[in-house]
From Swiss-Prot:
The chain crosses the membrane at residues 444-462. It is found in: Membrane. Residues 1-23 form the signal peptide. It is a single-pass membrane protein. Residues 245-271, 385-396 have a biased composition (Polar residues). This is Reelin domain-containing protein 1. GO terms for cellular component: membrane. The keyword Transmembrane applies. Residues 24-179 form the Reelin domain.
């Protein structure tokens, strides 16, 4: 009877262990979704500070619908795990997992694929997941992980760093807009600006990109315009229709110079939302003053388009009649407060991508040059009407020459400045080259002499060795008149000499066997 009871108890224990082992090897149960505790053992979890597992989130903030990569790294192998994303506010499960590693499967705790667990008991160490945020805002979240290293060793609810939700203001913190500068498009007419000026718009949000522009001054520009360097960090505001506007990131004001631009029918006029009335009045006054100059530039532009000889250079010439009007308009310009005033206007003339330099030589790929400067006073009316010209201008320049407005007589012409050569002087390098060669000549001569001496010594040594060991002499003395004679050379070789005439001998080198005759005389047998 006792034997049967023991067998029944053993069978029940085996079945319980098998069921628990099966549940452990095929993943966590849905019962563990709430507290994330393994249900197959009753042991206490390990201390949170003793675990060797880290949860890395590749982003610190997210927006609704974003996908966040999550990586679980461990210095030791483990078999089971349960991963969830929970809200920091109420600890509710949030989001779904869209990508899971091998040997794992998705779970459904409160919604489909909102948790991940293991699918087998294979050893695991590094796992990668992709979590997708819900479409509705849920606030800041954390990733919680429970890991089972062995049957009795596990860690529950290991937390990751907080992933904050992006708000509307923080999402656009890098693209905040500070429009403070009225800047028409490069190809925009002043008449279009005048027509759109009386209708101010409501404040709108425009994306901006922060850029750093290097200030490059043309030769002689500092003497002509009395330019002062200012910070070249500006904002580029993008408007609809691929239009861009430059503005200063701080609260700097801008003054407009005399603008003479080419017309373009595909450019839409754009105005800054924060526009003062007096700036509009000044812009309209500048338009009226430069109307004749604009007409002259327009006629010149059409003339150069019709004439194929001027298809690569657009010349912008201002008329003589508008010279005094420009001077008066510049004198009527309202003085701004001394707040590090910045002038950012556009150039008076725009050249095409190819210009003629020299005697018809075509120079392509012009480089735009930006000038930034600050002026604190009004330009004086003198011999030049271009004293109030733009201090920040994009001027195309070729590889060898630069084009800038001509001087004198108050007439805005196009001139060719002196040629600048950024490369070092080649003549100086050529003058220094023979000096280096002269310094190295004695060393080269000494090296050649030593080489010749060594070669001669080597040749003499080889000749001596050849004489000693290669040329062997054999001396034979014929003291007795005999037809045949045997002699031994100085090298120990035995030779046979045969007399074939009165003064003729034949030297034969051979091997001989000496035979002692019975008579007492020696005879050589060949």
């Amino acid at each position: 009877m006792r034997m049967q009871a023991a067998l029944v108890g053993w069978a029940c224990t085996t079945l319980c262990l098998a069921s628990c082992s099966s549940a452990f090897s095929h993943g966590a149960s849905t019962v563990a979704c709430d507290d994330m505790q393994p249900k197959h053992i009753q042991a206490q979890p390990q201390h949170q500070d003793s675990h060797h597992i880290t949860i890395h989130t590749h982003r610190t903030s997210y927006a609704p619908g974003d996908k966040i990569p999550v990586t679980v790294r461990s210095s030791r192998d483990f078999m089971g795990f349960l991963l969830q994303a929970r809200r920091v506010s109420d600890h509710q499960i949030a989001g779904t997992f869209v990508l899971i590693p091998p040997h794992s499967k998705l779970m459904t705790c409160f919604q489909e694929a909102d948790a991940v667990t293991h699918s087998d008991k294979s050893l695991k160490r590094n796992l990668s997941f992709v979590w997708k945020a819900p479409a509705q805002p849920v606030g800041d979240i954390k990733f919680l992980l429970s890991v089972v290293q062995s049957y009795f060793v596990y860690w529950a609810r290991i937390e990751s760093s907080v992933v904050s939700q992006q708000t509307h203001s923080s999402a656009h913190s890098d693209d905040r807009m500070e429009p403070r500068l009225l800047m028409p498009n490069l190809h925009q007419r002043l008449g279009d600006v005048e027509g759109a000026a009386p209708a101010p718009r409501t404040p709108i949000t425009l994306p901006q990109q922060h850029t750093h522009v290097f200030a490059v001054a043309l030769p002689g520009a500092a003497e002509e315009d009395n330019l002062d360097p200012v910070p070249a960090s500006i904002w580029v505001t993008k408007f609809p229709g691929d239009a861009e506007t430059l503005s200063q990131p701080s609260s700097h004001t801008a003054t407009e110079g005399s603008i003479n631009q080419q017309p373009s029918g595909d450019s839409n006029p754009t105005l800054e939302p924060s526009l003062e009335v007096h700036r509009l009045e000044r812009l309209v006054a500048l338009k009226r003053v430069s109307s004749e100059s604009f007409a002259s530039s327009l006629s010149t532009h059409h003339r150069t388009q019709d004439d194929p000889s001027f298809d690569s250079l657009e010349t912008c010439l201002s008329s003589d009649g508008g010279e005094q009007d420009k001077t008066k308009a510049s004198n009527r310009t309202v003085t701004q407060p001394p707040l590090s005033t910045v002038q950012l206007t556009y150039p008076q003339c725009l050249w095409s991508s190819e210009t003629f330099t020299g005697n018809g030589v075509r120079a392509s790929n012009p480089i735009p040059v930006l000038q930034t400067s600050g002026t604190s006073g009004l330009p004086a009316a003198g011999d030049q009407s271009e004293a109030s010209r733009a201090s920040a201008s994009f001027l195309p320049q070729s590889k060898h020459k630069e084009l800038r407005a001509g001087k004198g007589n108050g007439e805005g012409g196009v001139g060719y400045p002196r040629q600048t050569n950024p490369r070092p002087d080649i003549g100086l390098e050529g003058a220094q080259a023979p000096l280096g060669i002269q310094l190295r000549t004695p060393q080269l001569g000494i090296l050649l002499c030593l080489s010749a001496t060594l070669g001669m010594a080597l040749a003499a040594g080889l000749r001596y060795l050849h004489t000693q060991y290669c040329h062997q002499q054999t001396e034979v003395s014929f003291s007795e008149p005999a037809s045949d004679a045997v002699a031994r050379s100085n090298s120990g070789e035995t030779v046979h000499v045969r007399k074939i005439g009165e003064n003729s001998f034949v030297l034969v080198q051979a091997e001989y066997n000496w035979i002692t005759p019975s008579v007492g005389s020696k005879k050589t047998v060949l």
